[in-house]
Amino acid sequence: GDDFRDIDVAFVSAGGSVSLEYAETITKHGAVMIDNSSAFRMYSDVPLVVPEVNAADALVRPRGIIANPNCTTIQMVSPIQRVHVATYQAASGAGARGMAELDDQIRAIGRGEEPEVKKFAYQLAYNLIPQIDVFADDDYTKEELKMYHETRKIMHSDLQVSATCVRVPVTRAHSEAIWVETTEPLELDAVREAFRKAPGIVLQDDPEDQVYPMPLFIAEKDPVYVGRLRRDLSSPKGITFWCVSDQIKKGAALNAVQIAEYLVAQGSLSKK
């Protein structure tokens, strides 16, 4: 039914149009709506939350809504000044139909047939597509602009962010190459230790033994995996690294559940 009177928290993951249509129904009796779509992310009165970074923002929610950031934004945020990122986003980012299309195309090519293109702009199998979502201002895609705006909102800062988002022929788990510039030079060992201690992050970084994160081994796991940590040769204040995360887990479901767990721990779900 449409009565959320006895519901404390509702996880909404049915797309932006559904979120906009049902938000008032869900929240009018005090239920907290944790929304996985992009519908409310940039509303000034809706907190955008990654629990490990800005959990307390979830406590102030005038509309009764908390937005879950875009999956690639969640993977990247950390207290920094300037970021360049190139994303390598799996077919699963386009949903079940995206994964099925990649699988169908690979099978068709294996049979010597012409692959069918429906969900993506071009054939994804054995290809890279440097476009995710439609093109917007300054020839950036909407996905790239989401990373820019959402990261700045989560960090409460004028952080400089530039992204290039690429769809890759991987079934599940997004990867990112990230270049970070800080205000002062950082010791690499200190950065490594910070990653090691950070909640929700697993450091997989041993180049001598070829240890680094790969989507093949990270699908269906919760943490963000970080490796290839090194100094940026182009900047004395720069660090560069590689990270991989299953965007269906930390990028959506897990982050939403962590927000709810934080609200419970803070006693923030009791209805007045």
Where are each of the predicted segments found?
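C-terminal active-site/capping subdomain that shapes the small-molecule cofactor and substrate pocket
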Residues: L159-K272
